[in-house]
A protein has these predicted regions:
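Short, well-ordered beta-strand elements
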Residues: 2-4, 30-39, 89, 99-102, ...
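N-terminal lobe/hinge region of extracytoplasmic solute-binding protein
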Residues: 2-96, 126, 199
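Aromatic- and charge-enriched surface segment that lines or borders ligand/interaction sites
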Residues: 13, 23, 27-28, 48-56, ...
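Short, solvent-exposed loop/turn elements at domain surfaces
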Residues: 26, 42-48, 55, 72-75, ...
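Alpha-helical secondary-structure segments
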Residues: 34, 117-124, 152-158, 202-203, ...
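Gly/Pro-rich hinge or "lid" segments in bacterial periplasmic/extracellular proteins
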Residues: 60-85, 171-241, 246-250
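Surface-exposed binding/hinge segments that line
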Residues: 103, 137-184, 203-210, 306-311
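Extracellular/periplasmic solute-recognition and catalytic clefts
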Residues: 146-148, 207-218, 243-307, 318
Length: 325
């Protein structure tokens, strides 16, 4: 039994950890952060290919083991390949990893006040198999032949011995947990586009959805997990607002005009030359590089060998010689 799981050995944080090292556990809470994105949306269900889901449409859902909001990565950010209990307080598994048992926190509740139970976890797992992407369902059925509720706050997953089991604890530990009662009451389908939002157990709730214009979420004052070590120093904004714009140029202009308050710049050319506008000159905009210590994602250049220049073997050889390895 353990309070977390690591792909690579010992956990960085002990069972009695109080917060992650990179957070301020006493960080002030309040205010609003607004972000700009380009594009449009017509749904708040990101688990289907039908329609286009809005920003923050997963922000209210939690999992047994901790993930960053909206599925942006595992927690903690300073310990790669590690997971710590969120809705589950303990994870239990043998050395062979043939199975895993999650022991859940009885105090966990959905935003409508109903308890989060192992029945909801099993329902969510089965819903993904029955109504999720077919490719996902086919792969998971082969790897997880059975899942069973032991009691209201304990669930067991059994893994196939025909596949590597190292990542399977992460797989089942990070599936979103949905309310079984809500789905049964409303008849909602996971594979259908919809704007109706099921209750989640997370620190934020969807406050307002203006299709193709904005999505606003607010901190839930009744959130059950504020005092958990995994949440200390996090979820500090009272409101997060995402504004939609027709394209990236319009989104940048909105930032320059002060309509949105935060922007992540990924274009080197913009970073070097586009930040010369009145608000910047007045000191109302802080331009700062943030060090990212996480392992970089894989990137590459893909050549279209059907193009006329690359049909020439000598050109391909010249391109290969340009690389210093």
């Amino acid at each position: 039994k353990s309070h977390g799981y690591s792909f690579y050995g010992e956990l960085t944080y002990s069972e009695d950890y109080t917060h992650f090292n990179y957070v301020n556990p006493d960080a002030p809470k309040g205010g609003e952060i607004s972000l700009a994105v380009s594009g449009s949306f017509d749904s708040m269900n990101p688990y289907t290919r039908k329609g286009r889901a809005g920003a923050l449409s997963t922000v209210m859902y939690e999992s047994l083991m901790g993930e960053q909001l909206a599925g942006t990565g595992l927690l903690p950010a300073d310990a790669y390949g590690e997971l710590y209990g969120l809705v589950a307080h303990t994870v239990e598994y043998p050395e062979s990893k043939d199975w895993v048992i999650f022991h859940m926190r009885p105090e966990a509740t959905f935003s409508d006040g109903s308890p989060v139970t192992a029945h909801d976890v099993l329902f969510s797992h089965n819903l993904l198999l029955d109504e999720g992407l077919k490719s996902y369902a086919e792969a998971i059925r082969k790897r997880i032949p059975s899942a069973e509720v032991i009691d209201d706050h304990t669930i067991k997953f059994t893994f196939s011995k025909d596949f590597s089991r190292r990542t399977m604890i992460e797989q089942v530990g990070t599936i979103p947990i949905w309310s079984k009662a809500w789905y049964e009451k409303t008849g909602a389908k996971l594979d259908e586009s919809r704007l109706e939002i099921s209750p989640g157990s997370g620190p934020y709730i969807i406050k307002d959805v203006d299709v193709n214009r904005s999505v606003t979420v607010e901190r839930n004052p009744d959130y059950w997990g504020w005092d958990l070590p995994i949440n200390k120093g996090r979820h500090n904004f009272d409101r997060i607002r995402v504004e939609y714009f027709a394209d990236t140029t319009a989104a940048f202009e909105a930032f320059k005009a002060g309509e949105v308050t935060y922007r992540t710049e990924s274009d080197p050319k913009n970073w070097a030359s586009a930040y010369d506008f009145p608000a910047m000159d007045r000191g109302h905009v802080i331009k700062e590089e943030l060090r990212d210590g996480s392992p970089p994602p894989m990137s590459g250049i893909v050549f279209n060998l059907g193009s006329d220049p690359l049909k020439d073997k000598r050109v391909r050889q010249a391109v290969a010689l340009a690389y210093n390895f």
